[in-house]
Amino acid sequence: MLFRSDYGVPQNRERVIFIGSRDGETATFPIPKYCKDGQTLPKWRTLKDGLNGLVDAEPEYMSYSENRLKYLRLLKAGQNWRYLPEELKKEAMGGAYNSGGGKVGFYRRLSWDKPSPTITTTPHQKATDMCHPVELRCLTVRESARMQTFPDDWIFYGSVSSKYKQIGNAVPVLLAKELGIYLVNLIQGNKTQGKEIFEQLSLFSL
């Protein structure tokens, strides 16, 4: 289980990665380059870091309904539905108000100072809202691509929803690069320091 944030991706999500060895060698993974608190390594990159310098001349995004905007206008960066006035919470949440779970994604404005939540294929969905910290819209296609560490000149084809799907389903570029370089070094017999994983998940035991 690897944290994207540990490898320079400004996004907070775990990813299950399998590395197999037919020679019976201990499986290892790339050493993290960032850490959460910034004490031993550079601190995790934030949404602000990820979007720094982005020029989105023709932004593409899915629009919110006026009903959704009614509540998002009342929220600041880093807040969600729980910060709405008490008398509006139940109205805003509807049937989800009494359901279980943390529901942290409802009416969520992203925080500048933390890694982005998981980039999904539908950033405008009510339960997994990816609303910009200060603007009344979800992250644009290009902003979402930045969170997945795609280069700005990478071209996505199709409709706006198709582009979001391509981005949300992708493995973050920086994470894939770190894994690729690490595996090439292993295959070539280079002595590469790795992060040893000893835990066997019972989920995969036969």
Question: Which residues fall in each region the model found?
Answer:
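C-terminal target-recognition/interaction regions appended to catalytic cores
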Residues: 66-206
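Class I S-adenosyl-L-methionine
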Residues: 1-100, 104
